[in-house]
């Protein structure tokens, strides 16, 4: 995630991440803090690691079926709007890239999604799985955001 804020003193960002981390909830931490050089409108996509955990082991053929699901031309899920209503949203055009691998108990998805106008929360991949491949619904999902990218796939800074 990207947190855009202003400070009341001159700073290059050093030391701010450590100070912010002292007040963050468990599981959330600030990785870096730096001066904004570019406008937010140049932010294009988000890269995340999505881990699907299966207590009884990954179902046979799950990685291939999930790879096919994420490559579909249309992938409609129900998503809450800002008004808290449910709306059908096609997330397929918002998925830029998805690499799927697996071991015995986990499926790993290295995914790049559209970040804004509209943006896709990578956590919603779980909803797509539940809607289209309910037999592959994992016991637990972990999402770790890795990078925020510009239109050229470079780190947004």
Describe the function of each predicted region.
Residues 4-6, 49-53, 99, 110-114:
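Residue-level recognition of well-ordered beta-strand positions that form the cores
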Residues 41-43, 59, 118:
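Short capping loops/turns at secondary-structure boundaries
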């Amino acid at each position: 995630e990207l947190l855009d804020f202003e400070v009341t003193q001159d700073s290059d960002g050093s030391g701010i991440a450590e100070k912010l981390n002292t007040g963050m909830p468990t599981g959330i931490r600030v990785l870096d803090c730096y001066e904004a050089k570019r406008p937010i409108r140049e932010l294009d996509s988000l890269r995340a690691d999505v881990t699907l955990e299966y207590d009884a082991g990954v179902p046979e053929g799950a990685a291939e079926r999930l790879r096919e699901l994420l490559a579909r031309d249309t992938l409609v899920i129900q998503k809450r709007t800002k008004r808290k209503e449910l709306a059908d949203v096609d997330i397929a055009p918002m998925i830029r890239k998805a690499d799927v691998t697996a071991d015995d108990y986990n499926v790993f998805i290295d995914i790049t999604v559209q970040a804004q106008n509209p943006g896709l929360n990578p956590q919603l991949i779980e909803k797509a799985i539940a809607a289209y491949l309910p037999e592959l619904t994992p016991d637990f999902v972990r999402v770790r955001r890795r990078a925020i990218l510009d239109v050229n796939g470079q780190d947004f800074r």
